[in-house]
């Protein structure tokens, strides 16, 4: 079987979960640190209404900036997120069948579910979880979402997160992200991951670690914090949550610059968590839950 390209992996995941009945959503147009931060997870996992969706989410972690020189760590990367609420009883079987669709023969590989409970301090979110290892390499994360914004999830939703670069490294049998086959073409039409993303990786690394203006970021954080609280009071939790995401990203940028002390870091985490919580509470209130 021909090894899937990066974009074929995404299309295969989308088709598989679409056939299961998930709505295929688009990436959220904001700077987020992980697919979990998409409002389709944070807001929609709350409340009692069923919700089954899947989407790709480009994600940014300024602290992982390496100027494009690290084999598998970048400040910008892609995740594929699946949310199933309520969680189906056969979720593990569904996941394993999905691996087979990606060309991973379960009979010839060691698939393990390794307990790894998940927590996001800035979202006030946590859940029971497992890393999925294939021949000793983590390829996905399972989480039974128990709370978001400090609010209990009823019913519990299942979140499956695929680290697309890591999954592609395994499927294609290469060691360096920039060498990944992006589009499955040959000759002039062939694209490697490095051709698509690595100049941006170099430039954003320089910005994140050297040129970002910490005083400006501190002002922006405070502005987004105030705006979020104002919008919640105006019964607009969705634009308020956008401001929460901005504040979270500004915090991550400040952290990458190394200008926040350990004590200050804890304070900033609590401030972002408060914003996430009031957005979630207002969302539930307006939903009649």
Curated annotation (Swiss-Prot):
Disulfide-linked positions: none
Main location: cytoplasm
Reactions performed catalytically: tRNA(Gly) + glycine + ATP = glycyl-tRNA(Gly) + AMP + diphosphate
InterPro entries: aa-tRNA-synth_II/BPL/LPL, Gly-tRNA-synth_heterodimer, Gly-tRNA_ligase_asu
EC number: 6.1.1.14
Record's keyword terms, sorted: Aminoacyl-tRNA synthetase, ATP-binding, Cytoplasm, Ligase, Nucleotide-binding, Protein biosynthesis
Assembly, per entry: Tetramer of two alpha and two beta subunits.
Gene Ontology molecular function: any one: glycine-tRNA ligase activity
Protein name (record): Glycine--tRNA ligase alpha subunit
UniProt-annotated location(s): Cytoplasm
Any single biological process term in GO: glycyl-tRNA aminoacylation
Family statement drawn from the similarity comment of this UniProt entry: Belongs to the class-II aminoacyl-tRNA synthetase family.
GO CC annotation: cytosol
Alphabetized Pfam families for the sequence: tRNA-synt_2e
Broad class of enzyme this protein falls into: ligase
Keyword Glycoprotein found: no
């Amino acid at each position: 079987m021909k090894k899937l390209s990066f974009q074929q992996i995404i299309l295969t995941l989308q088709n598989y979960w679409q056939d299961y009945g998930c709505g295929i959503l688009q990436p959220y147009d904001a700077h987020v640190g992980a697919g979990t931060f998409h409002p389709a997870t944070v807001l929609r996992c709350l409340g009692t209404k069923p919700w089954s969706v899947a989407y790709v989410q480009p994600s940014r972690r300024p602290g992982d900036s390496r100027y494009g020189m690290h084999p598998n760590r970048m400040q910008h990367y892609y995740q594929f997120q699946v949310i199933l609420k309520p969680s189906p009883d056969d979720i593990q079987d569904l996941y394993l069948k999905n691996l087979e669709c990606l060309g991973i023969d379960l009979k010839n590989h060691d698939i393990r579910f390794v307990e790894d409970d998940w927590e996001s301090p800035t979202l006030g979110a946590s859940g029971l979880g497992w890393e999925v290892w294939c021949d000793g390499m983590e390829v996905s994360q399972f989480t039974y979402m128990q709370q978001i914004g400090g609010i209990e999830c009823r019913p519990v939703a299942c979140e499956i997160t695929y680290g697309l670069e890591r999954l592609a490294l395994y499927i294609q049998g290469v060691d360096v992200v920039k060498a990944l086959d992006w589009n499955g073409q040959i000759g002039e039409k062939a694209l490697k991951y490095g051709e698509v993303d690595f100049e941006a990786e170099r430039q954003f690394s320089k910005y994140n670690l050297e040129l970002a203006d910490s005083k400006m970021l501190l002002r922006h954080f405070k502005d987004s914090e105030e705006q979020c609280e104002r919008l919640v009071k105006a019964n607009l939790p969705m634009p308020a949550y956008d401001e929460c995401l901005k504040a979270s990203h500004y915090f991550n940028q400040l952290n990458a610059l190394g200008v926040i002390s350990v004590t200050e870091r804890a304070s900033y985490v609590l401030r972002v968590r408060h914003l996430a919580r009031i957005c979630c509470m207002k969302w539930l209130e307006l939903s009649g839950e």
